[in-house]
């Protein structure tokens, strides 16, 4: 039986960013150093495949610190945590490792610096996302105002329009954020802007990679978790760039093949917490149904690496 021809365009960069890679290594090295169980507050990264693999190795995922015993190490997720969390871990004499992405930590430090200079903070982000909760939790309650949309800007009530600064979640849509920033600067001309864009290199690169293939494809598949902010943004970027069909899938088994009927070219992208093995799985699923040609489209090479915390490079002690 002859299979219909189809071209798969693989967007690159895709998949693991340096912060995700570091966070996963932290859990693996902690298990190697201290043995199982090692506790992790919140999913280390938003990907079920990754979390399940680490759970099989002996990681125990909890949502709150009080679910972890005080005599076992605990790791904080890549998204960052409010200041109160490590303070509470220290109060309980717990061994903890902070896997917060260094680029998220940069935003934390930026918020603290502005606060120390007497500026009120405005954060562009998604309410309830762990990164937003963690960043807002670096400052006293009420010191950070959250905006999610351009419309939110009009309703902001600030202490002093001359004493403001803004920061952003690192995984936002570049285009949407630019519109919100423009609205902030129009309403508050004196607002202090970040020294460097808070949206991280990996988010920027992955959105750019989707835009680069959007004009060549009939449909887009983004491999990522439904709670992954950067993966959901890739779907939105694809739709905004003209992709009639744009699906977010965790595994190849999630693909809606009916929606792909008639497609002769499909783009594949992957969020920053999706491992390459899941991309391979999707390619295999297409090869089983189509005479598939695979073309990689790389927009930039990524060479960023982050070191793991010193505590994991030191000899083990009983926690």
UniProtKB/Swiss-Prot annotation:
Binding site for [4Fe-4S] cluster: 17, 101, 200
Pathway(s) per entry: Isoprenoid biosynthesis; dimethylallyl diphosphate biosynthesis; dimethylallyl diphosphate from (2E)-4-hydroxy-3-methylbutenyl diphosphate: step 1/1; Isoprenoid biosynthesis; isopentenyl diphosphate biosynthesis via DXP pathway; isopentenyl diphosphate from 1-deoxy-D-xylulose 5-phosphate: step 6/6
Cofactor (UniProt): [4Fe-4S] cluster
InterPro entries: LytB/IspH (IPR003451)
Binding site for dimethylallyl diphosphate: 46, 79, 129, 228-230, 273
Cofactor note: Binds 1 [4Fe-4S] cluster per subunit.
One annotated GO molecular function: 4 iron, 4 sulfur cluster binding
Binding positions (isopentenyl diphosphate): 46, 79, 129, 228-230, 273
GO biological process, alphabetically ordered: dimethylallyl diphosphate biosynthetic process; isopentenyl diphosphate biosynthetic process, methylerythritol 4-phosphate pathway; terpenoid biosynthetic process
Residue stretches spanning the membrane: none
Keywords: 4Fe-4S, Iron, Iron-sulfur, Isoprene biosynthesis, Metal-binding, Oxidoreductase
Pfam families: LYTB
Catalyses which reaction(s): isopentenyl diphosphate + 2 oxidized [2Fe-2S]-[ferredoxin] + H2O = (2E)-4-hydroxy-3-methylbut-2-enyl diphosphate + 2 reduced [2Fe-2S]-[ferredoxin] + 2 H(+); dimethylallyl diphosphate + 2 oxidized [2Fe-2S]-[ferredoxin] + H2O = (2E)-4-hydroxy-3-methylbut-2-enyl diphosphate + 2 reduced [2Fe-2S]-[ferredoxin] + 2 H(+)
Sites where the protein binds (2E)-4-hydroxy-3-methylbut-2-enyl diphosphate: 46, 79, 129, 170, 228-230, 273
Keyword 4Fe-4S: yes
Active site location: 131
EC number: 1.17.7.4
Protein family according to the UniProt entry: Belongs to the IspH family.
NCBIfam families: ispH_lytB, PRK01045.1-2, PRK01045.1-4
Function: Catalyzes the conversion of 1-hydroxy-2-methyl-2-(E)-butenyl 4-diphosphate (HMBPP) into a mixture of isopentenyl diphosphate (IPP) and dimethylallyl diphosphate (DMAPP). Acts in the terminal step of the DOXP/MEP pathway for isoprenoid precursor biosynthesis.
Protein name, per record: 4-hydroxy-3-methylbut-2-enyl diphosphate reductase
